[in-house]
Structure formats: structure tokens, C-alpha cells
């Protein structure tokens, strides 16, 4: 195993510090290319609440939320077109991080891209729309730092917090796969590559 700066929530849930930092420019260029094909939008929950982070997708499947529920779709319900192809750097980085975290041969088929502006947040939630919970989740942070909340298997358990910085990855799975997680509101700040924004790539095996 390479010399990696692990910051553990548990044996099954790891922060890999600076893991993506050497690839940041390439990752941001790929996000820009994806957005040209499928722009960011503020999705709504099934109850009609608009999410504060704007989102887009790439890969074989895209995660969507609307009045019909939370789910994965092979085509964008807004355009009826397939999602943009997932860049190889996304897939390769997620596979490498998963391997280094003990989850061997992870093959993601969906990448949700969140864009956070100041004050945008993500409430505690579980990722449970996937078909196979034996597959881990890989999350890549770019831009402004944020406080990540990592809770338990019930919403009432008090979450542990860690700051996530530009280039950090979080990998979790196994018995932690359905732990609640979220982020606190993004603070006003500036990053030299993305200004006042934070981007988050969440790679999953949806099908």
C-alpha cells in the first residue's frame, strides 16, 4: 500500500487526505465539460423542497429527485437524453481509493456532482437508492473546505465531524455503508481554482 494519509472514522470509513490533489485541474476540467452537456440544476425533494446544492450527473446512471421520488435513471428526465459519459479519471480515482481502503475492484457506474455555493448544505441522509449495498461509496472534495457530518445507522445518533479540504476523498462501506451523512452550510471563502465554490463528486455502483 502506498504512503497515504488516512484519517479514520472507523475501520470501514476513511478520509484519504490530499488523495486527489495532484489531479485537481484535470477533475475540474472534466466537470466543466460535463456541465456543457448537462448543466447544474437545483433538484426538488418528493415533498417539493428545493435542495440548496445544485447537481448534475455523469455515467451510465444518474441520481434524480422529484415528485416521483429518489431514484437512478439511465436518461435525464428533463431532456430524455443519456447522461454524459463518466470520465476515466473519475472512475480510476474512485477505484484506486476504494482499493487502498480495502474495497477491491470497485466499479462505479454513477457519479453525482454537487456544486455548493456559500450557505448551501446537505442534511443528514442515507445513500440507499442503490441495488447492491456491498459496494462502497467514494466521495471527492474540490474547492472550499466544509464540515462533513458522519452519523450512525439511525438519524438520532450524534454525528462525528471532520473538515474536508480540497483533494480529500472519503470512502465508506461494509457495516458503515448505510450510515447517515451530510455537510454543514458552506462558509464564505475563496479557493484559487474555483473561487467561492465547493464541488463534490460522489461515485457509486447504482445497478
Placement of each model-derived feature along the sequence:
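Non-heme Fe(II) oxygenase metal-center motifs and adjacent flexible, charged/small-residue loops
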Residues: 1-207
Amino acid at each position: 500500500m502506498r504512503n497515504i494519509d488516512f484519517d479514520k472514522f472507523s475501520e470501514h470509513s476513511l478520509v484519504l487526505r490530499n488523495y486527489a490533489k495532484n489531479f485537481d485541474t484535470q477533475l475540474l476540467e472534466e466537470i466543466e465539460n460535463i456541465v456543457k452537456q448537462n448543466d447544474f440544476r437545483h433538484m426538488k425533494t418528493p415533498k417539493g423542497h428545493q435542495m440548496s446544492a445544485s447537481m448534475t450527473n455523469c455515467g451510465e446512471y444518474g441520481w434524480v429527485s422529484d415528485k416521483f421520488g429518489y431514484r437512478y435513471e439511465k436518461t435525464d428526465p428533463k431532456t430524455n437524453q443519456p447522461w454524459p459519459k463518466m470520465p476515466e479519471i473519475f472512475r480510476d480515482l474512485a477505484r484506486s481509493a476504494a482499493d487502498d481502503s480495502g474495497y477491491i475492484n470497485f466499479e462505479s457506474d454513477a457519479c453525482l456532482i454537487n456544486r455548493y455555493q456559500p450557505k448551501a448544505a446537505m442534511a443528514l441522509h442515507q445513500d440507499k437508492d442503490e441495488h447492491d449495498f456491498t459496494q462502497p461509496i467514494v466521495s471527492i472534495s474540490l474547492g472550499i473546505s466544509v464540515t462533513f457530518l458522519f452519523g450512525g445507522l439511525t438519524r438520532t445518533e450524534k454525528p462525528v465531524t471532520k473538515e474536508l479540504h480540497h483533494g480529500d476523498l472519503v470512502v465508506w462501506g461494509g457495516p458503515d455503508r448505510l450510515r447517515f451523512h451530510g455537510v454543514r452550510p458552506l462558509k464564505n471563502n475563496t479557493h484559487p481554482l474555483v473561487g467561492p465554490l465547493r464541488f463534490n463528486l460522489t461515485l457509486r455502483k447504482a445497478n
